[in-house]
């Protein structure tokens, strides 16, 4: 398993949500990055508001840490409605979901994180709720059992997932709006770092924000996490201002290199280079070589490496690119 203190792991850590909540943007006007998503959502939200209707059900997918929960809350704020949040693993029984649905008010947002982890029984309850705003529930047991239908207020379901391919077709097809979040540019992350530094009362130079952004793997959650560690370093070792030099010293100290890689990324890449001659190599072999779960490799380690052009997924397995060799000062494999 990846250690819980891995700073550039984009999955949320305990108590991190309460810290990040204070610095998250509340409205689309403050939302930076994802320009196509932002443009589309502005139109869809304004249209729904002008018609006095609930927004179509929205599916948000993409790697962890890119702001799926933030966007869900922004949608609710823009619509000026309540949002009730839960997650797929929490909804163990159909009754758990029924209790949430029956407490919604007209136009409210129901946010289900990790929606791909809903059980089939719970998912069956969602279908009529999403399509017809009705709840089908069973009363009684055995031969005397009967089904009754309850009308629900119009609501918007927002589902978030890192594994859109794991959704069943009937569920996926019921979302009228589907948005994919992409990794953020250094420019957008620099803005986010500067904004967060302001909320943390930390003096931040533009160059310092860029240095943090470059090592944040295109992910706001990681950028904010690294910012907090740089703040600690600055408080103890510097005069209180984060410039490029201070940011670089702090990030080197916590073992996040200029490409945003930590020991696990380097271990992954070196395993393919040294143990498997640069690939191709199957996921099972990589998982065994580095002592990591396949799902974690696919969901946490590989997306950024692929996006940055360090590895390729091919039908024959994983292959490292010349970039990976250059990162370690090695000569690429000759075919």
From Swiss-Prot:
It is found in: Cytoplasm. ATP binds at residues 23-24, 65, 68-70, 131-133, 174, 184, 221. Residues 4-184 are annotated as: Large ATPase domain (RuvB-L). One of its GO terms (biological process) is DNA recombination. One of its GO terms (molecular function) is four-way junction helicase activity. Its main location: cytoplasm. Mg(2+) binds at residue 69. Its EC number is 3.6.4.-. GO terms for cellular component: cytoplasm; Holliday junction resolvase complex. Residues 185-255 are annotated as: Small ATPAse domain (RuvB-S). Keywords: ATP-binding, Cytoplasm, DNA damage, DNA recombination, DNA repair, DNA-binding, Hydrolase, Nucleotide-binding. DNA binds at residues 313, 318. It catalyses: ATP + H2O = ADP + phosphate + H(+). Residues 258-335 are annotated as: Head domain (RuvB-H). NCBIfam families: PRK00080.1, ruvB. Has 3 domains, the large (RuvB-L) and small ATPase (RuvB-S) domains and the C-terminal head (RuvB-H) domain. The head domain binds DNA, while the ATPase domains jointly bind ATP, ADP or are empty depending on the state of the subunit in the translocation cycle. During a single DNA translocation step the structure of each domain remains the same, but their relative positions change. The RuvA-RuvB-RuvC complex processes Holliday junction (HJ) DNA during genetic recombination and DNA repair, while the RuvA-RuvB complex plays an important role in the rescue of blocked DNA replication forks via replication fork reversal (RFR). RuvA specifically binds to HJ cruciform DNA, conferring on it an open structure. The RuvB hexamer acts as an ATP-dependent pump, pulling dsDNA into and through the RuvAB complex. RuvB forms 2 homohexamers on either side of HJ DNA bound by 1 or 2 RuvA tetramers; 4 subunits per hexamer contact DNA at a time. Homohexamer. Forms an RuvA(8)-RuvB(12)-Holliday junction (HJ) complex. HJ DNA is sandwiched between 2 RuvA tetramers; dsDNA enters through RuvA and exits via RuvB. An RuvB hexamer assembles on each DNA strand where it exits the tetramer. Each RuvB hexamer is contacted by two RuvA subunits (via domain III) on 2 adjacent RuvB subunits; this complex drives branch migration. In the full resolvosome a probable DNA-RuvA(4)-RuvB(12)-RuvC(2) complex forms which resolves the HJ. Belongs to the RuvB family. This is Holliday junction branch migration complex subunit RuvB. It comes from Pseudoalteromonas translucida (strain TAC 125).
């Amino acid at each position: 398993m990846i250690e819980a203190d891995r700073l550039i792991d984009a999955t949320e850590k305990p108590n991190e949500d309460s810290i990040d909540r204070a610095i998250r943007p509340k409205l689309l006007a403050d939302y930076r990055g994802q320009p196509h998503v932002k443009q589309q959502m502005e139109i869809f939200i304004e249209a729904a508001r002008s018609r006095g209707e609930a927004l179509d059900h929205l599916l948000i997918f993409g790697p962890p840490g890119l702001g799926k929960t933030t966007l869900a809350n922004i949608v609710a704020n823009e619509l000026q409605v309540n949002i009730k949040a839960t997650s797929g693993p929490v909804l163990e029984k159909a009754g758990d979901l029924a209790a949430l649905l029956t407490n919604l008010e007209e136009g409210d947002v129901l946010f289900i994180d990790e929606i791909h982890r809903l059980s089939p029984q719970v998912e069956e309850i969602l279908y009529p709720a999403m399509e017809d705003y009705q709840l089908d529930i069973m009363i009684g047991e055995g031969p005397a059992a009967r089904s009754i239908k309850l009308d629900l207020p119009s609501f918007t379901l927002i589902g978030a997932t890192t594994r859109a391919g794991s959704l069943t077709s009937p569920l996926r097809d019921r979302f009228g709006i589907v948005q994919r979040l992409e990794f953020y540019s250094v420019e957008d992350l620099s803005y986010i770092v500067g904004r967060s530094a302001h909320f943390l009362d930390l003096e931040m130079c533009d160059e310092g924000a860029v240095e943090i952004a470059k090592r944040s793997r295109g992910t706001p959650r990681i950028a904010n996490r690294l910012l907090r560690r740089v703040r600690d370093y600055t408080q103890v070792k510097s005069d209180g201002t984060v410039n490029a030099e201070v940011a670089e010293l702090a990030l080197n100290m916590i073992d996040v290199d200029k490409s945003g890689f930590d020991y696990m990324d380097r271990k992954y890449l070196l395993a393919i280079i040294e143990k498997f001659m640069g690939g191709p190599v199957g996921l099972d072999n990589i998982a065994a070589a580095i002592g990591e779960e396949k799902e974690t490799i696919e969901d946490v380690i590989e997306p950024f490496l692929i996006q940055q052009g360090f590895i390729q997924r091919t039908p024959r397995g994983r292959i490292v690119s010349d970039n990976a060799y250059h990162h370690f000062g090695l000569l690429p494999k000759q075919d």
